[in-house]
């Protein structure tokens, strides 16, 4: 085990705080409508330009190990917020930095870190309740477009496209973002289905960067039971190899010899293949397999109806234009099923929904209906250069995540106003323990950080903006950084999803409170480079050359 370098107390916190500041300062320049871009060097290919907080955070690695630990903890805030809400990563980073800074000052002044943490948690709970109380549901397509526009950095066409896509496939529908070959950004609605089963082996992956399996113009084998032996599969595998098309196997499970053979074939390039477990359980699994069979124009291979795996022909397999599989989900796009068959199945499910008395069954039937009838919307992002397309794609993905979050938990006034107004709820909390109260006050001050940063990125003094907003009694009064005017945020369409604001604060406070309570840091000592081999000593006996008159 290699030797470790250990830092304690103030020294540890100072180094950690430096790392937090370096990462947060790089991320927070992107906040708000007048936030700037960050240019990131890539080891190969053109540099990447982005305004997405989590993308910037993930690229930062520092030389000093103690500073790097602080930066990595803050990176965790951005990643967690991105995973849960899909947007709000920069806001979360700004909040975390503000809480860590104030917390470090309080600890240096001799306050108890554990009491500070308790105070931070009490205040955050009050803010979350306040945000949930203020949130109002998204009522119209226009409001969905507003949320998308704000998250896409004021790009109204993107907001409209997302609203259009959601209208077509429903709020629960599947929307994916792809790069377009042309200059235009457009929405394409494709019939399709998504279910929550990922690939059975990572060896099936075709796109190593995204860790996904992508199969085009694919055959789909649907089997009701487990597939474990190879012999029964050979006839259909040989037929698929001759056709030159990829194959997706959906079965109760694929294991043992069958899975091993498929993996070996995939690695040797003989057969482009992937396998996933069938979605659902019991009777519901069978019903979902039948749904997929109808959608893809295939036949469910089931011994109940007298079809064995050995006798399967290509005609019995389903077809789809594209299948995308990641670790957790499978999306089938452009199934070759006949329209009348799909329509008949939809009507059948609708009839079952009306007949059932169980809420759980009704919910599951509605899920199946959405998958069959909803389809998949694809937003194809275009641009003049690859760099521009990637930057725009980041913004579209953020906007899409924000609109989904808005549909789930409603919207609040944007531009940091919801957090600023929540100060009133925190101000009402009083605790007899002075250190717990100091923790509450840390959050009280941190709630101003996002709006200050938005104002400062727009070239306006943050304190003046905060003062003006707090003077006004209207709950929706705020600062429009785009026009540098004070407006009614809801009337102007400057809104944030309540889920994004809530998640940003919860993740920021959770990690920041842990950093504040840190008393020691341990890192590996850098290894000393091995000494170089000594140089050649010259040939012995050559020392008497001095008299040669050189």
Curated annotation (Swiss-Prot):
Coiled coil: none annotated. Together with its co-chaperonin GroES, plays an essential role in assisting protein folding. The GroEL-GroES system forms a nano-cage that allows encapsulation of the non-native substrate proteins and provides a physical environment optimized to promote and accelerate protein folding. GO terms for cellular component: cytoplasm. This is Chaperonin GroEL 1. The keyword Chaperone applies. Forms a cylinder of 14 subunits composed of two heptameric rings stacked back-to-back. Interacts with the co-chaperonin GroES. It is found in: Cytoplasm. Belongs to the chaperonin (HSP60) family. InterPro entries: Chaperonin_Cpn60_CS (IPR018370), Cpn60/GroEL (IPR001844), Cpn60/GroEL/TCP-1 (IPR002423), GroEL-like_apical_dom_sf (IPR027409), GROEL-like_equatorial_sf (IPR027413), TCP-1-like_intermed_sf (IPR027410). Its main location: cytoplasm. SUPFAM superfamilies: GroEL apical domain-like (SSF52029), GroEL equatorial domain-like (SSF48592), GroEL-intermediate domain like (SSF54849). The lineage of its organism: Bacteria, Pseudomonadati, Pseudomonadota, Alphaproteobacteria, Hyphomicrobiales. GO terms for molecular function: ATP binding; ATP-dependent protein folding chaperone; isomerase activity; unfolded protein binding. Transmembrane segments: none annotated. It comes from Rhodopseudomonas palustris (strain HaA2). It catalyses: ATP + H2O + a folded polypeptide = ADP + phosphate + an unfolded polypeptide. ATP binds at residues 30-33, 51, 87-91, 415, 496.
């Amino acid at each position: 085990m290699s030797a470790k370098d250990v830092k304690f107390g103030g020294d540890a916190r100072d180094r950690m705080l430096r790392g937090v500041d370096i990462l947060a300062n790089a991320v927070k320049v992107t906040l708000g409508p007048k936030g700037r871009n960050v240019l990131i060097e890539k080891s190969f290919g053109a540099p990447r330009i982005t305004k997405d907080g989590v993308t910037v955070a993930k690229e930062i690695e520092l030389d000093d190990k103690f500073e790097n630990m602080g930066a990595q903890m803050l990176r965790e805030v951005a990643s967690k917020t991105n995973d849960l809400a899909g947007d709000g990563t920069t806001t979360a980073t700004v909040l975390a930095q503000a809480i860590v800074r104030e917390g470090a000052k309080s600890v240096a002044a001799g306050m108890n870190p554990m009491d500070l943490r308790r105070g931070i948690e009490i205040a955050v709970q009050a803010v979350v309740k306040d945000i949930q109380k203020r949130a109002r549901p998204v009522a119209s397509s226009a409001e969905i477009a507003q949320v998308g526009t704000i998250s896409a950095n004021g790009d109204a066409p993107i907001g409209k496209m997302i609203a259009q896509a959601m209208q077509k496939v429903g709020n629960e529908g599947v929307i994916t973002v792809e790069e377009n070959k042309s200059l235009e950004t457009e929405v394409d609605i494709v019939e399709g289905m998504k279910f929550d089963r990922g690939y059975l082996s990572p060896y099936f992956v075709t796109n190593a960067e995204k860790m996904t399996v992508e199969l085009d113009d694919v055959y789909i084998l649907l089997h009701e039971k487990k597939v474990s032996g190879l012999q029964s599969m050979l006839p259909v595998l040989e037929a698929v190899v001759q056709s030159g098309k990829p194959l997706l196997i959906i079965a109760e499970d694929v294991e043992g010899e069958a899975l091993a053979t498929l993996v070996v074939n995939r690695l040797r390039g003989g057969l482009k293949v992937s396998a996933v477990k069938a979605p659902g359980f019991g009777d519901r699994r069978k019903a979902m397999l039948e749904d997929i069979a109808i959608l893809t124009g295939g036949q469910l291979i089931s011994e109940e109806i007298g079809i064995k795996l050995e006798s399967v022909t290509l005609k019995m397999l389903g077809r789809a234009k594209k299948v995308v599989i990641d670790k957790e989900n499978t999306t089938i796009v452009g199934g070759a099923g006949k329209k009348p068959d799909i329509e008949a199945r939809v009507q059948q499910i609708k009839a079952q929904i009306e007949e059932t008395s169980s809420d759980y069954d009704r919910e599951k039937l509605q899920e199946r209906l959405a998958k069959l009838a909803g389809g998949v919307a694809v937003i194809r992002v275009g641009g003049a250069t690859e760099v521009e397309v990637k930057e725009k794609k980041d913004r579209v993905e953020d906007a899409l995540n924000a609109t989904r979050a808005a549909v789930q938990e409603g919207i609040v006034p944007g531009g940091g106003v919801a957090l600023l107004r929540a100060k009133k709820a925190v101000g009402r909390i009083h605790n007899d323990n002075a250190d717990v109260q100091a923790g509450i006050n840390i959050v009280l001050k941190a709630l101003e950080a996002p709006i200050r940063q938005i104002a400062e990125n727009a070239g306006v003094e943050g304190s003046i903006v905060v003062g003006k907003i707090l003077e006004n009694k209207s709950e929706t009064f705020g600062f429009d950084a785009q026009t540098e005017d004070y407006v009614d945020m809801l009337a102007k369409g400057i809104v944030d999803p309540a889920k994004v604001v809530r998640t940003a604060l919860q993740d920021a406070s959770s990690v920041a409170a842990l950093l504040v309570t840190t008393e020691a840091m341990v890192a590996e000592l850098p290894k000393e480079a091995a000494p170089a081999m000594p140089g050649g000593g010259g040939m012995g006996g050559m020392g008497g050359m001095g008299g040669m008159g050189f």
